[in-house]
Amino acid sequence: ATTRCDPTLIPIAGGWFELLEGGEALRYRCPPGHIPTPLARRSCGPDGQXEPLXXXXXXXXXXXXXXXXKCRAVWCPPPQDMEHGSFWPRLPRYPPGSRLHFQCFQGFNLRGAPNRTCGEGGRWSGVTPVCDDGSGDCPAPPVXXXXXKEGSRYLLEDTVRFRCGPGLVLLGSAVRQCLEGGVWSGTEPQCRAPLSFDTPSDVAASFMASLSQSVERADSNSSHGPTEKLPRXIRVDGSAXLNVFLLXDA
C-alpha cells in the first residue's frame, strides 16, 4: 500500500503544509518573515505518521526532539556601536523590512552602504559600512551587525579580532591582519542567527558581486584589456567558510 501522510497528525502552528511525492512526504510553509522549525520537510511512515520532529543542536552536537512544528519569526541582529559614527533607529532586534541609516562623525568618511534593509532571510542588505579617516596602512575593517571588534590600530601587521553576541554564530575570519597593499587577511566576519538563511536574492547578489570582481575588470597596471576575461579564483583560508549553491533548472 502507498504510504500517505495523515493530515490530522502533521499541523504546524502559524503556517500550513503541502504534500509531496504523492503524499509520502510534506513541506511546511510559513508567512513571509517566518521559517518552519525545527525542520521544513518530513517523511511519513506506513501508519501515516510523520517522522519525529528532531533538529541538531549545535552546542551539544546532538538531536533534540520537539513536540510540534511551528513558524518562528526571523529577525536581523542589531549592530554594535559604530566606531567613529552612529546609526538609527536603535532597536533590540529588527524584523524583515526594517531600515537602518548610518553616518560618520566629522573628519571620517563613510565606506559601504549608508542605508541597509533587513531581508526576509534575517540578513542585512548592502555592504557593511565603516567610518575611516585614512590614517592607517589598511582601511578600517568592516564590523558586521552584532559583532564586536578588538583592536583599533590599522598599521602593517596589526591584527583585529571579532566575536559575536550571545546566541549568534560567527562565519568568516575571527582574526584579521593588515597586509602589504592595504588589504586585510581572511574574509569579513558575519554574525548569523540560527534561523537566518540565504534567500534567492541573496544568492543572486553574491554571484553578481563575484562575477563583477573577477570576470571583466580592467587593470591599469597590467597588459589586460578593459574587456579581457581574467581567471576566476576562490581563496578560502582555514577560518573562512565556503558556501556552495547548486542551481537546478526544472
Curated annotation (Swiss-Prot):
This is Complement factor B-like protease. Required in both the classical and alternate pathways of the complement system. One of its GO terms (cellular component) is extracellular region. PROSITE patterns: SUSHI. It is found in: Secreted. Glycans are attached at residues 115, 221. Belongs to the peptidase S1 family. Disulfide bonds join 5-44, 30-71, 76-118, 104-131, 138-178, 164-191. One of its GO terms (biological process) is proteolysis. Plasma. GO terms for molecular function: serine-type peptidase activity. It is an enzyme of class 3 (hydrolase). It comes from the Eukaryota. Keywords: Complement alternate pathway, Complement pathway, Disulfide bond, Glycoprotein, Hydrolase, Immunity, Innate immunity, Protease, Repeat, Secreted, Serine protease, Sushi. Its EC number is 3.4.21.-. Residues 3-73, 74-133, 136-193 form the Sushi domain. It comes from Gallus gallus. PANTHER family: COMPLEMENT C2, SUSHI DOMAIN-CONTAINING PROTEIN. It holds the Pfam family Sushi.
